[in-house]
Amino acid sequence: MEFLKHYEDDEDQDDENNTKDENVNKINKRQHFEIENVIDEIPDLPLSFFENFKKIKHYSSEIIDETNKKTRLFEHVEGNYPTFIYFKVPTKSRNDIKELIEQVKEIGNEINIKQDTETCFHISISRTFPIREHHIETFTQELKKTLKNQRSIDIQLSKECCVFINDNQSRIFLSIPINQSFKSNILKLIERIDSCLSLFKFPKYYDNPEPHLSISWSLITNNNNETNDENINYIPLNKFKNKEIIRDNLKLTDSFKVSRIFWNIGKTESFIDLQ
């Protein structure tokens, strides 16, 4: 009987061990499945995150940079870096483009849009969006992969001078759009970049895109009251419409080749050469 008792105890112990092994296997399989799902997803930046950016103009939480009175689209958060993609417009080696820019600046002085943009003139081919630090390397690799076989394109500025208003209606820009005959080249490039951005759930470029070279800008005020700040010029909100043509007889410049695409992540500039 004692022998049978030991036998039954051993058998129970084996059953218990088998049950534990099965449970462990189930847990391992479940964990493996969950890990695979996590790898397949890009977390941290849901679409609702960017929907909030679109609504930012309705809140008093807009961030004012007191250095230059610019309104940021989103608040600075440690670990987030403002990012955008663009190509540069040659000005140092192109007198015709420099003369065109000076002509637009004179128009800006006439209509009070006269705050100079940065000295490095460029055309953006993405929105500005925040990227998390741990996504930077993956995003950079994917963007390079997307543009790896992209050929250089020819671009020509148009004869029109237009105004563009930013998303949160805080600034107005005096700009030169792309000549319509060359527009399809850049739109195809934007489509490729959008395909990369969508993988990370970053916002795509604007609907009905109108890529442009911004020359000067002004802050927008919601009323007609003059500001006490003599160093900053303001434009009433309803004075101009977005994409309104101010002048359509600018001197036509020659085309130029875009053979390098840049992107800024925070203060770091990177680029890739096109074929």
From Swiss-Prot:
Q: Which residue ranges are recorded for the region named Disordered?
A: 1-25
E.C. number(s) listed in UniProt: 4.6.1.-
Q: Reaction(s) catalyzed by this protein?
A: a 3'-end uridylyl-uridine-RNA = a 3'-end 2',3'-cyclophospho-uridine-RNA + uridine
Keyword Nuclease on this protein? yes
Cellular compartments annotated = Nucleus
Q: What Gene Ontology molecular function terms does this protein carry?
A: 3'-5'-RNA exonuclease activity; lyase activity; poly(U)-specific exoribonuclease activity, producing 3' uridine cyclic phosphate ends
What are the record keywords, sorted? Hydrolase, Lyase, Nuclease, Nucleus
Q: Name one GO biological process term.
A: U6 snRNA 3'-end processing
- GO-annotated cellular components: nucleus
In its keyword annotation, does this UniProt entry include Hydrolase?
Answer: yes
Q: Write out the residues that bind UMP.
A: Y206, E210, P211, H212, L213, S214
Quick one: which residues bind AMP? H122, I123, S124, Y206, N208, P209, E210, P211, H212, L213, S214
The record places the active site at: H122 (proton acceptor), H212 (proton donor)
Matching entries from Pfam families are given as: HVSL
Give the family per the record.
Belongs to the 2H phosphoesterase superfamily. USB1 family.
Q: What does this protein do?
A: 3'-5' RNA exonuclease that trims the 3' end of oligo(U) tracts of the pre-U6 small nuclear RNA (snRNA) molecule, leading to the formation of a mature U6 snRNA 3' end-terminated with a 2',3'-cyclic phosphate. Participates in the U6 snRNA 3' end processing that prevents U6 snRNA degradation.
Q: What is this protein called?
A: U6 snRNA phosphodiesterase 1
